[in-house]
Amino acid sequence: MKKIGSLKLGLSFAGCFLGAGYVSGQELWQFFGSFGTLGVAGLLLALLVLSAAGVLMLNLNRLTGYDEADKLILGGKAGILRHAVTFLELLLLFCIGTVMTAGVGALAHQLLGLPTFVGGLLFAAAVAAVSLAGLAGMVSVFSATVPLLCLISLSFGVYALCRFGFSVGSSDPGNPLMGSWVSAALSFASYNLFAGIAVIAPLGRHMKSSRSVFGGVLVGAGILLCVAGSVLLCVSAAPKYADAELPMLAFASGLSPILAALYGVLLLLAMFGTSVSALVALTNTLKLKSRTLSAHPKAPTLLCAALMFCGSLYGFGDLVGFVYPLLGYLSFVFIILMTIHYIKVKHEQNNLS
């Protein structure tokens, strides 16, 4: 794989997180919109933590050469803790792919009236096919889809601002797993970053310089902020859609069928990019940990895609509200451990120089 610059890193960094929950408004509303004005502060805090930890993770990859989450978080020696990290990483990646597949099922049902399992099945097959191309295929997908995602989201945000004005919903946190805007922000940043380790960390060694790392993460955070701001503006302006499985699609449908179709395409692109990244990271990790699976490169991809489809039948909104917050709190512990590892590596380097 060739060296990449700040722009491609930024697109890949943002693309990992611009999934069904994010762009549909479901995830953003549950984590931030339900806290009213404080939710805005929560979003900014989450993106700050996500960006800082992202730069740290990529630089740690450049310093150590480690790609695997367990080694990046704990170093080369950690015994049973490394197995715990690997298990949680695999679980989180699987859950993300499952949530994205469930999102497509909800999209197919809400937009086209198709049974949810039909859309999910077709989507899982397409994701599996593209994921066989590996890391290079993932970067290509993000380079093509993320700019379009950002442009369409901003257009909807500007439209909502011009038509409805600026509005922030009242504070009404409905999820007991997120008791405050601070805990919601930390949970959001933690599970997103932990899920992205296996996807983003390997790009560190392909960066042109450490300055490119900082610039790329900054670009990615800017894209995430623009999309999140646009989505929250729209849902806050029409809170009656907040209870829908896909709030932003419901908002677009309330405006016109053409806009609903346009946003449906946007959601599909978002879900596709995130699903590909999750499946690539999941299968790469499995193959690194198992010689048997590494000898059969296609089998893990196809099997994981099939299992994600089966898990998606549980339902999109329920998965977002339960899986993400719970895994976010667990991931926060590992983010702290990765920071400690980075400090140790820098200290050792300073002693040698």
Regions found by a protein language model. Give the residues of each.
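Extracellular loop-to-transmembrane helix junctions
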Residues: 2-7, 31-58, 214-226, 323-334
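Extracellular/periplasmic helix-exit of transmembrane alpha-helices
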Residues: 54-58, 166, 187-188, 220-251
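Transmembrane alpha-helical segments of multi-pass small-molecule transport proteins
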Residues: 6-14, 42-51, 55, 83-94, ...
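Transmembrane-helix boundary/entry motifs in multi-pass membrane transporters
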Residues: 2-4, 34-40, 63-92, 110-114, ...
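Hydrophobic, membrane-embedded alpha-helices of multi-pass small-molecule transporters
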Residues: 4-23, 42, 89-93, 97, ...
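Hydrophobic alpha-helical segments and their helix-loop junctions in multi-pass secondary transporters
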Residues: 20, 94, 127, 148-174, ...
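Membrane-water interface regions at transmembrane-helix termini and the short interhelical loops
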Residues: 30-33, 60-63, 100-111, 124-145, ...
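Juxtamembrane transmembrane-helix boundary signature
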Residues: 44-71, 230-234, 238
